[in-house]
């Protein structure tokens, strides 16, 4: 497999579960040959049960279905829930599951964080949505704001090949092409062009971040980044300020109502640096932000699973698509500017932490801990992640008519 820009694709932006889940379930319902689904979280709630029903129906009509769940993100599916799928023929794997220690999950680092669906080499979905009711507006104030894309065209074959190369037993072939192939330069940006990029812990450790940095270097007019967990490294922060100082309008949308308090603490450590450097920072206040999208000028955009924090940039398995398409760029721009106008508060100097020695000391210590601890973990020796396949449930012993007659009469057959 070679990473390259693919032309002639159909690209559709999907916002939140209201748009994403019906599109995915419809595609699964129309699948004829193969379904591959990867996700970090699958809950046994209303949304999870709909996915369960769609996959079960597909398997029962003869479609080959394979599921990869992260062992940390999805630890609590019931045996009955999973066994019903495996009994129907669904190949069900957990990425690097570990036993709990005193009831707590310990396998927090190097997770499989991708969210990908491939249907028959015809349709693919990639983005930030998991399978849980948290992505539906009906969930309430804690419902997540998120994005994905539906793709048709040549890029789907690349995504399918990426998935096939990552199945068990393909490691030798995978290492050969990963060692030699990097994404080539798109020297003639056009329309409906898509590139698959990913992060792993082998030869593609910084591919997604590298595309972001290149985008910031090439930006001429405007960059909008909406990212749920924003805590990048020095190079990224420096590139943001440098772009702002040469006149690029930089809009950064981050969580104002985070699902984890430390997310807000981490982001606010950067406010002085960013705002005083000319970056427009907006806190999204309507509900928790879970999206991972960005755009540049009038043609470049990205959507995927990668946050801009140490876990995504240094440890987790992630996947994004880079898109060159003016129509898609405008659609995403309209959406992001809409939530800025309706649901965001711009961070101004009155909201910045006071520049005291104590605050500066706290910020420096917290920044270095939050930023470097996960990265340091990434350099520690790591075991080879294990893919644990869940086998079909054992079939009950069949009661033959002879056995029944023997029990009823007491006579041996």
From Swiss-Prot:
Residues 108-135, 285-312 form the PLD phosphodiesterase domain. It comes from the Bacteria. Its EC number is 2.7.8.-. One of its GO terms (biological process) is cardiolipin biosynthetic process. It is a peripheral membrane protein. Keywords: Cell membrane, Lipid biosynthesis, Lipid metabolism, Membrane, Phospholipid biosynthesis, Phospholipid metabolism, Repeat, Transferase. One of its GO terms (cellular component) is plasma membrane. It holds the Pfam family PLDc_2. It catalyses: 2 a 1,2-diacyl-sn-glycero-3-phospho-(1'-sn-glycerol) = a cardiolipin + glycerol. Catalyzes the phosphatidyl group transfer from one phosphatidylglycerol molecule to another to form cardiolipin (CL) (diphosphatidylglycerol) and glycerol. NCBIfam families: PRK11263.1 (NF008427). Belongs to the phospholipase D family. Cardiolipin synthase subfamily. ClsB sub-subfamily. HAMAP family: Cardiolipin_synth_ClsB (MF_01917). This is Cardiolipin synthase B. The gene is clsB.
């Amino acid at each position: 497999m070679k990473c390259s820009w693919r032309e002639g694709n159909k690209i559709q932006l999907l916002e939140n579960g209201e748009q994403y889940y019906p599109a995915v379930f419809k595609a699964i319902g129309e699948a004829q040959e193969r379904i591959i689904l990867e996700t970090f979280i699958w809950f046994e709630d209303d949304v999870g049960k709909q996915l369960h029903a769609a996959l079960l129906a597909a398997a029962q009509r003869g479609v080959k279905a394979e599921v990869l769940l992260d062992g940390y993100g999805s630890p609590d599916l019931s045996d009955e829930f999973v066994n019903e799928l495996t009994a129907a023929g669904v190949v069900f794997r957990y990425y690097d599951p570990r036993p709990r220690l005193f009831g707590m999950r310990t396998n927090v680092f190097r997770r499989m964080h991708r969210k990908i669906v491939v249907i028959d080499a015809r349709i693919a979905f990639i983005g930030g949505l998991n399978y849980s009711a948290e992505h539906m507006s009906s969930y309430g104030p804690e419902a997540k704001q998120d994005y994905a894309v539906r793709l048709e065209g040549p890029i789907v074959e690349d995504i399918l090949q990426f998935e096939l190369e990552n199945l068990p037993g393909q490691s030798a072939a995978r290492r050969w092409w990963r060692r030699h192939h990097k994404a080539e330069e798109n020297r003639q940006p056009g329309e409906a062009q898509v590139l698959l990029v990913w992060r792993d812990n082998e030869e593609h450790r910084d591919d997604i971040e590298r595309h972001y940095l290149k985008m910031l270097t090439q930006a001429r007019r405007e960059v909008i980044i909406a990212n749920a967990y924003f805590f990048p490294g020095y190079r990224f922060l420096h590139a943001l300020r440098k772009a702002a100082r040469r006149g690029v309008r930089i809009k950064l949308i981050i969580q104002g109502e985070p699902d984890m308090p430390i997310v807000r603490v981490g982001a606010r450590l950067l406010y002085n640096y960013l705002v005083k450097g000319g970056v427009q920072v907006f806190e999204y206040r309507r509900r928790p932000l879970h999206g991972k999208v960005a755009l540049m000028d009038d043609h470049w955009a990205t959507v995927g699973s990668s946050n801009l924090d140490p876990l995504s940039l240094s440890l987790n398995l992630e996947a994004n698509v880079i898109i060159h398409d003016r129509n898609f760029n405008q659609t995403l721009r309209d959406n992001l500017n809409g939530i800025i106008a309706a649901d965001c508060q711009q961070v101004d100097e009155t909201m910045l932490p006071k520049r005291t020695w104590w605050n500066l000391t706290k910020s420096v210590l917290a920044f270095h801990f939050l930023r470097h601890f996960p990265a340091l973990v990434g350099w520690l020796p790591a075991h080879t992640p294990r893919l644990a396949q869940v086998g079909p449930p054992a079939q009950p012993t069949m009661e033959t008519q002879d056995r029944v007659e023997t029990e009823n009469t007491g006579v041996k057959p």
